[in-house]
Amino acid sequence: MVDQQLRLRGIEAQAVLAAMAKVPRHRFVPPPLTRQAYEDRPLPIGYGQTISQPFIVAYMSEAARITPGAKVLEIGTGSGYQAAVLAEIAAEVYTVEIVPELARQAERTLRELGYRNVRVRSGDGYQGWPQHAPFDAIVVTAAPERIPQPLIDQLAVHGRLIVPVGTQSEDQRMTVLTRTPGGIIEQKTFPVRFVPLTREKPKEYQPYR
């Protein structure tokens, strides 16, 4: 997967390539899809959600420019695969999932695989996780129509926010925001297609740990 799907498509960061080679993607897909786990395409994981294709996971991880001591926020835990990749590189990963059942399953899988530097919370990803801000990087794995202001506010200086932006009926663009001492720099890159970032059932949510 690393050589054929990632290096050939321009992924160069060694930490990202090593993480992608180490994390067992088959543990993050439903059992009937295990044989398809290492194909470069998204797969359904239930509740209308998907696990992103490996190239997209690698691209977002590389674009975030994560350093070994970094604190990272992920919005859209899904099955936990992106969080596991981030946890191989960063010191701390905080991840928020709107679907409680997915959050519980992701936490269970991450625990079974020994990831002790990941904290999972079920809640509204639009609000981020302000109690642990600022974050050196924020990775959003579902598409909002506009970038939520709370996520921008929770980004550390020199931090990077990686997010697909757009509606389900128009082109979405992978977008990179960088916070500099002088303000925010926004860069739109290639077209993508992600499930929408939802914010249903607003209420107080508690961490699972």
Set out the residue ranges of the language-model regions:
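Conserved alpha-helix/loop element of class I SAM-dependent methyltransferases that forms part
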Residues: 3, 7-8, 32-33, 37-41, ...
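Active-site/binding-pocket entry motifs
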Residues: 26, 35, 44, 183, ...
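Conserved nucleotide-cofactor-binding alpha/beta core module
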Residues: 65-185
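Extracytoplasmic beta-sandwich strand-turn segments characteristic of Greek-key/jelly-roll folds
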Residues: 46-47, 136
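N-terminal auxiliary segments of SAM/dcSAM-dependent transferases
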Residues: 1-35
